[in-house]
Amino acid sequence: MSSLYLVDGSNFLFRAFHAMPMMVSSKGVPTGAVRGFASMLLRLIGEHKPTHLAVVFDAGGKDKRAERFPAYKQNRAECPAELVPQFDLASKLVSAMGVVCLQARDAEADDVIATLARQAERSGEQVVIVSSDKDLMQLCRDGHIQLLDTMKEEGRGKLFGEAEVLEKWGVPPKQLGDVLALMGDSSDNLPGIPGVGPKTA
């Protein structure tokens, strides 16, 4: 059966950066994260054998959420200097592998992934989103869209469908955004409603 795997490239690269030792090329360019990224991507392809594959990276630029809420993600530390040049290297690596590499300026990778997933769903494709980003769990639809978190199950990965999202969050995927808005989301610096925690939300 045809399957479309959408890889959150920025998520993959950050994870590789924190998992790999510091490495540099003969020219002094950091390469450790790219090496880890390549290993993760090759493992994904080898184990799951997707018929279609795309890797999506954040491209920077203005974000519509930050325009509406200036504090959005302002609590996050700046990208480590050693990682910055590796985004371009990772993008070039993906393209050299013959894999579709996507970026959209002024749009987060999440938004691009969500758009592609919904378009593929309408076309009858089986979609697997590869990321550890909980925000993308909102897209899970049984028989259509699943999320694969390769960090789970000691590296074996865990597939999330509607039942798994419900078990983890207590609500179905379509209501996850409401829960995060009510209780807040510290990773995005969203305050939520004072006094409202996970159970109340």
Pin down the residues of each PLM region.
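Non-catalytic, usually N-terminal nucleic-acid engagement modules in DNA/RNA processing proteins
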Residues: 1-54, 58-71
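Extended two-metal-dependent nuclease catalytic cores across DNA- and RNA-processing enzymes
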Residues: 23-24, 74-201
